[in-house]
Amino acid sequence: MKYLPFLLFLLLNAGTATAQNNLVINGIPWFDDKGNIVNAHGACIVEENGRYYLFGEWKSDKSNAFPGFSCYSSDDLVNWKFENIVLKVQPDGILGPNRVGERVKVMKCPKTGEYIMLMHADDMGYKDPYIGLATCKTIAGDYQLQGPLLYKGQPVKRWDMGTFQDADGKGYLLIHHGPVYRLSDDYRSIEAEVAHIKGMGESPAMFKKNGVYFMLTSNLTSWEKNDNFYFTAPQIEGPWTKQGLFCPEGKLTYNSQTTFVFPLKCGNDTIPMFMGDRWSYPHQASAATYVWMPLQVEGTKISIPEYWQAWDINELKPVNPLSGSLQIEKKQIYADSCWHITKDKMESDAK
């Protein structure tokens, strides 16, 4: 690990000249309103009343043990305000000391108005997995852990997971290697297994576009990146068809792993925004970063044909992050990679 001086651009300094800051800049640390690194991995986004809420894993550089789930908010998906550690380490149980908490996902239940949080809980050896359930009356408040999510009265003992909320208000739990479960009307338990997608991997993420359901997933390479792939279906129940990669082969999903697909409003349309993690185990708090980019959709085909180091979230086009930027004082951060300028482009050797 290197301790590097990192020259921050004003574009990255949340809370400073925010009116000029509409760029998503991939693969480098983001900073919140307090000047701290945005620490929200394996994340999801919930939009409410014109504001976006980012939930993720509050990582540590010292241990993979669960330190809590974080929440940030923003009105533009670029400048983030720290809200709360919305679920803290529990005194005991599935998210007690020396346990793992990952893949946090939050949905608002349309029937009850309650915020439902699901997550993967485990022991440090990943041999005691559970899908956990927590609830809260307010979106960024203190969530209460209710225990394992139950299906037919039994805990769901699986690990990598995601969620999907359909336009009809039904909620779904997505599980590694293929199971898709429909949640009960109050989202507090599982009602039925509605599909099993053969050939799936880990980190499932689902979205719907033009009547087609898409399921993104990664291969199994632990913390290492790989070429993620996807499936499609005319309905959640299937039949599901494997379509292949959505990034160029060998690009390793631009050194990231799928975590979520957010429906980004663009005029009268909605653009699916890929959200991926660049893991940097064991230095996840200081060196792990994010890759967010719009997915191109044509029928049953999706793609991210090229990597955008930075892009304008309003115009959905790539931008040179050095163009017109103003440099500010240096800050010290931990990093496992170096940044350099080549032919007026900012590039990283991040793994």
What are these regions (language model features)?
Residues 1-21:
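Bacterial Sec-dependent N-terminal signal peptides
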Residues 347-351:
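Short beta-strands within extracellular/lumenal beta-sheet-rich domains
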Residues 19-345:
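Carbohydrate-active catalytic/glycan-binding domains of CAZyme proteins
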